[in-house]
Amino acid sequence: LNGTVVRAQLLSGEESMVCGSTVAAAGYVSVEVSTNGLDFTSDGAQYESVWSVVSGVAPRSGPVTGGTVVTLTGTGLVASGARCRFGASSPVAASVDSASEARCVSPPSGATGWAALELLSFDESVGGGSFLYDERVWVSAVVPLLGPVEGGTRLTVLGSHFKETTTLACRFGRGSGASVAARYIDSSEVECATPVQSGVSARSVEVSVNGQQYTSFGVAYTYVASAAVSWVWPVRGPAEGGAPLTVHGSGFTASSEALGYLQCRLNGTVVRAQLLSGEESMV
């Protein structure tokens, strides 16, 4: 390679492979071959030596179960022989989309914590960073269990192993369900505002810490028709309270009553309500 001689390993009767390039500078070099150690060809084959630099890793974390699609960004990334190595795990295939971006999928890990992440080219490290293996996130319950299709309900999601990240999110429905940013409360609780839903239906609520991989526990949140008040009877009553007030309207449901959600608010005072029919409730 230019003036540097290295040993080659025979692959077949027609081709050989250099065991390792010792080119110390970026640029094109002339590659020639000798079969007797003295006389070299003069065919002028070219090899481009590039400096590969990895400057970014995203996302920086994923579950110990693996499966995170990790994007490495940098300069001079080469597709030939590209693989990724996470810690002491065996290297996995890498896809180099351009000289500035490569992708690989994290393998499972037997332990949580930081692991060195290396981008390899023919088993030689050309740069990398670090990747954090997290505990698997769990979702166990949501409060409340239902809300209006217009969205905007402040939903509390309970579970375990939540982390405060900029990518923390809730998803309503599997696959292409709507995702919204979540607010971290603690490792067992996050909050998110329910998105708008086109119709009455149940949606599983899942959580992602890295913005890519969501839980799959199927805890349901039910979208219901919004309640509306048409009129009340009587329109006047004693100031000391205690008189029954019938509220007429729509969207009052037995499930809301059974869950203890059916309530009336009189100015700032909230009281439980009893359902009379699908169109009216009574304090």
Summary of predicted features, one role per range:
Residues L38-G81, D123-E164, Q212-E257, V271-R272, ...:
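Beta-strand/beta-sandwich contexts
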Residues L10-G13, A94-A99, A182-S187, L275-G278:
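RNA-recognition motif
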Residues S16-T22, E101-P107, E189-P195, M282-V283:
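Exposed aromatic-hydrophobic patches
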Residues T22-Y28, P107-G113, V196-S201:
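Surface-exposed, short loops/turns at beta-strand junctions within beta-sandwich domains
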Residues Y28-S30, V69, W114-A116, R154, ...:
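Short, conserved beta-strand segments of beta-strand-rich sandwich/propeller modules, principally
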Residues L1-T4, L77-P91, F162-A178, F252-V271:
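Short, surface-exposed alpha-helix to beta-strand junction/turn motifs within ectodomains of secreted
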Residues L1-V18, N267-S281:
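Thr-biased low-complexity repeat/linker tracts and other Thr-enriched repetitive architectures
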